[in-house]
């Protein structure tokens, strides 16, 4: 198992790196050049930089990921593709994407896009909380223990 992180706006990178390093599972952070950092990462953590174009990180993750790898993303499109490839996919707010819930999530995203296209506003996501982070930590630890 390897862990791929859609890292541009991921608020749980520290949790992923800490827990995966303890478990000696490789972590690959995929991020755009616009988020370049000289920060040194622990052994077993690699950063791959991609162009800043839309979905560039998603395409790179899908190119690299194999069946049973774990992917952390908030992108429903990437989650859907990764599930079809046989990957385990988690959202940073502490829930697991499944074949049962992804269709509803994609449908909701589509309907919200249509509302915005018509000139109306939609509610954004709720703020990320410390409770969300702990929920993610518990789920993540259970997934890497499998």
Curated annotation (Swiss-Prot):
Pfam families per record = DUF188 (PF02639)
Q: Which residues form a coiled coil?
A: none
| Domain of life of the native organism | Bacteria
Annotated InterPro entries: UPF0178
Q: Which family does it belong to?
A: Belongs to the UPF0178 family.
PANTHER family with a match to the protein in the record? UPF0178 PROTEIN YAII (PTHR35146:SF1)
What is the designated name of this protein? UPF0178 protein BA_3063/GBAA_3063/BAS2849
User: Which organism was this protein described from?
Assistant: Bacillus anthracis
Q: What is the lineage of its organism?
A: Bacteria, Bacillati, Bacillota, Bacilli, Bacillales
């Amino acid at each position: 198992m390897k862990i791929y992180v859609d890292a541009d706006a991921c608020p749980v990178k520290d949790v992923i790196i800490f827990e995966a390093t303890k478990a000696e599972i490789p972590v690959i952070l995929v991020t755009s050049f616009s988020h370049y950092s000289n920060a040194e990462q622990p052994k077993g953590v690699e950063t791959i930089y991609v162009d800043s174009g839309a979905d560039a990180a998603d395409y790179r993750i899908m190119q690299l990921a194999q069946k049973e790898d774990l992917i952390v993303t908030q992108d429903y499109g990437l989650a859907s593709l990764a599930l079809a490839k046989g990957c385990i996919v988690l959202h940073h707010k502490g829930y697991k994407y499944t074949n049962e819930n992804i269709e509803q999530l994609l449908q909701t995203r589509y309907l919200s896009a249509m509302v915005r296209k018509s000139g109306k506003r939609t509610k954004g996501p709720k703020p990320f909380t410390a409770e969300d982070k702990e929920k993610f930590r518990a789920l993540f630890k259970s997934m890497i223990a499998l």
